[in-house]
């Protein structure tokens, strides 16, 4: 194991007088000193990694990033940090760009692996390292000639937003901090990881890449290179711009601003595949936050479509990410959250979904919980929401003189209250729906007596309010076409419709029967394709 104890032992041999005053000799001395302390495979990995990034060798960079780095982390640094900057600098000739990228991985590893999480100083240093990276690529007069794999660019932006979220939660947890720590956080470090910094960086990446103009050009059938500009023509800037749009979606969702969350994605046709959606984790994260935003905006039909489409995608593409265990765990967790959210949406807005998704809901016993929710069990709604929602944050830190308390849960409890208020308005609607489905005509007084055998005239008046609520809640804004996910037309999503003439309810069943033909056609085509592949195999 390569850790702090080994450092302490080796440091006994450090000789201050070995420095000669000659910069070249001193650098050589430091290189040999730090290299002697590192395991050989770590040292050679860092040297080769630096060389691959210098040469822009994408294949080698991706292999070392996706495979070698996690393997060495597991073997040498499972619960400890990687070597610090000065140690690595000595063996990579102080390569500025590589050291910034290395520190991004270094602090990411600390957030993910070190028990107890990063210290305040490490959080602040990570923020300034991100600033160095973004200043390097945004403030340059000409595009920086840097090639990184798309998966690294996505995870870099995603980690940047995650560390903002993590710092906001750390900042809000006052009960675990001394008065000096609170003072230091609120006064000395009030600007680090601030929401304005995060939004500024993400919007700057979007602007410099001209990604919105490029996406609009693609939707109009125009060559995006004509509007990309000097920076946006490079894949490095273009993909950073695209991933920053998804980062903005996540940030606004964490703040509870669902309208703006969907708004920032306007150039992206959410419900269509694109050339930019080749990173599974990015596509899944996008759909999770879009679907959640739709649910909170009471656009249940769009939320159901978003969740169903991405869950089908996950079912069909598991082999793409199953080789990376940490990514597999993350995607499986997000998929589980989306099944919970889909179950909520189907209770509030029943409609037909793909049979394979229904099968998963049955196998995982979601139907029992869905039945309880249909019967008005608010605790099940609450537990499903708490499990599946994002970990919301407040854009502002607690006041310096705030009582010593844990403020982490405040944003989530506020969003939970908003959601539960909506659920309470709808909790009686499934009962009303179940009675209406049994009849084509039904007197108001008879329906009132079904709901309450001792119904009075006042109860009949209240029933009219409930029926009006049913009409209102079942009428949703539904996206049909166009680049804006906010647009749509009002449609009734209920399986039945009705109108009231005098004291008589006239009911029409609008339920669309299952289209089993499509299911069998897909299976036949899949079987034929498999049969062709088997015939082409040479044994």
Swiss-Prot record:
Subunit text: Component of the eukaryotic translation initiation factor 3 (eIF-3) complex. The eIF-3 complex interacts with pix.
Start and end residues of each PCI domain: 306-514
Name of this chain's protein: Eukaryotic translation initiation factor 3 subunit L
Keywords for the protein's UniProt record, in alphabetical order: Cytoplasm, Initiation factor, Protein biosynthesis
Role of this protein: Component of the eukaryotic translation initiation factor 3 (eIF-3) complex, which is involved in protein synthesis of a specialized repertoire of mRNAs and, together with other initiation factors, stimulates binding of mRNA and methionyl-tRNAi to the 40S ribosome. The eIF-3 complex specifically targets and initiates translation of a subset of mRNAs involved in cell proliferation.
Location(s) in or outside the cell: Cytoplasm
SUPFAM superfamilies given in the database record: TPR-like
